[in-house]
């Protein structure tokens, strides 16, 4: 797509030619694309019942490549690096889903990627979830684990080996990794023994896998937060009951001023009654911490100065629902907006440029779906955008801020291309006690948006918006292939 006069965006060609995308689609051994709008019931069941083809995507620092997680035969998932200029596809990783599954892959430089896989395995008869980080080159070579290697003498088995907390923009192939350390037992008679324990931070060179310690591991630390510029500015501890050894739900947080290694008390967060400030993200450019804080019975968004004053400012509140997160952008990960969910997932941009761009793109993309800024190139000029809605399963686009052009990269469900999909309508269902229960009604194509009685419209589907107060989770307005 290209930006025309008056801010109108016009359609342009795809990055992947139809033949190239069809080849990738077929090579995955996923499913043959059925004839649009003319399929049999069996074909429709196959198309709607299959897994999403595109399961995740990231864009390289140059903006010239993407890494795409795609569904393959059976329960397998493949990670492919795709050159957007030549449409060349390089497979870099694959899991069979028995039990390992690829969760995500992201660029840590033009030639280096980090992926996470995991699954569920039985240990002593109990199902235990696990996740592990690996690094791999963009050509598929040099795949290696990033966490501490497993030891037969390890005191325990870790479910997670760590996480990437800073992608260190500008430092090719370098990342800050929050790393889990496990000490060894039965050390008698061994010359070399592991004694470190807990959560620490290492700067990892992905070429050599050599690590430079940034924060020494500690057993009581639950999290570290970086400012996106390579500096650890916030850390949190969990409080454990000394008698039972159980976690209490209380967390204490500390922060550092710029260019300082001295920790300063930030406060306590109680996850049981949700009092205190819960850290979400550090904006290094503003030198502030964005956090959730209970105000008027709802989680609001506040910003706390990290200059030593701890000056607090309320950024946004919502008297109906909780604000649940922030939206970040660019190599330094500056905060540009916040998120919440009512009848649908919503993003509010307090950055004027992105607010205007979001409005323009929403009008330009077919069916006017919900637009989210997924990732960006290192210079922030190439944006990876996801457009999705109730009648649009989702399509990834690349937007150039310099030329104001928008090009399609790949649809999430290509087998549904051209099919008329059912719309989803937010409604309120009255309960016997008069309380209104939020819900979603999936209406069959051709209903004209009218709500029928189930006897006259047996294909309509109703689902609750909330999944129960105990979990705090909820459904949202979106496309659901199985509804």
Language-model segments: what does each one mean?
Residues 24-35:
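C-terminal segment of classical bacterial N-terminal signal peptides
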